[in-house]
Design a protein with these regions (language model features):
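Alpha-helical transmembrane signal-anchor/signal-peptide segments
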Residues: 7-24, 145-146
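Alpha-helical transmembrane segments of integral membrane proteins, especially early/N-terminal helices
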Residues: 36-56, 140-148
């Protein structure tokens, strides 16, 4: 439920910033109605995205057949991402339990060293991606879609498809960099903790050697 609130809060903020409702000739109520249908569909809270909204005073289906087909692919990708996230969490917990049992006292030291090595490599990789997205987001986003989808249903027409007007490049650019920022904050925070722990251990070891 918290994730739903977070998603909707972000969408509403971006809609206000981009003046989406005004540019499309929709009320905020209908704009949120269409968005809720998409988000609920992604999270398996509904079976389709069939909703009716008023666009420039005319009642119409919010999304056509092509958009509905594309959302099937998007939901599949979303579910795959959630599976990867859950597997990563399970592997992390399993690794920590293994180290706790086998390495005991040295667990935190080994974990900190390995995490810092991995974090540095990951930081370089994601910094390159972020740099690419910052310099040419359109090329970055197009490449992502070509890699993520096996068809061209993601190529929507702004003259006929509401979805691409709801979520223009500026919308996704903000979303991508916000996600990167959230992950970076977590990575950097844990990196600093690992660094401080290792420095403490080195000072402790140095003190013991000096005492001897």
């Amino acid at each position: 439920e918290f994730r739903r609130v977070l998603f909707r809060s972000f969408y509403k903020t971006e809609y206000a910033s981009l003046e989406t409702a005004q540019s499309l000739g929709m009320t905020e109520k209908d704009l949120n109605k269409a968005t809720d249908a998409l988000l609920d569909y992604l999270q398996d809270r509904r079976d389709n995205i069939n909703v009716t909204v008023a666009v420039k005073g005319t009642e119409t289906k919010a999304f056509n057949a092509r958009e509905s087909s594309h959302m099937v692919d998007v939901r599949t990708l979303y579910h795959f991402a959630m599976v990867l996230r859950n597997v990563a969490i399970i592997l992390l917990v399993a690794s920590l339990v293994y180290m706790a049992v086998r390495l005991k006292g040295g667990m935190l030291t080994i974990f900190s060293i390995n995490y810092m090595k991995t974090a540095i490599l990951a930081a370089v990789f994601f910094a390159m991606l972020a740099g690419w997205a910052y310099v040419d987001f359109d090329a970055f986003w197009t490449t992502f879609h070509k890699l993520a989808f096996r068809n061209d249903l993601w190529l929507l027409n702004p003259d006929t498809d509401l979805m691409i007007n709801l979520f223009p490049a500026e919308f996704f650019s903000t979303m991508v960099f916000r996600i990167v920022g959230m992950f970076a904050t977590g990575f950097i925070g844990l990196f600093v903790l690992c660094y401080l722990f290792l420095r403490h251990q080195l000072h402790k070891l140095h003190g013991e050697l000096h005492h001897e």
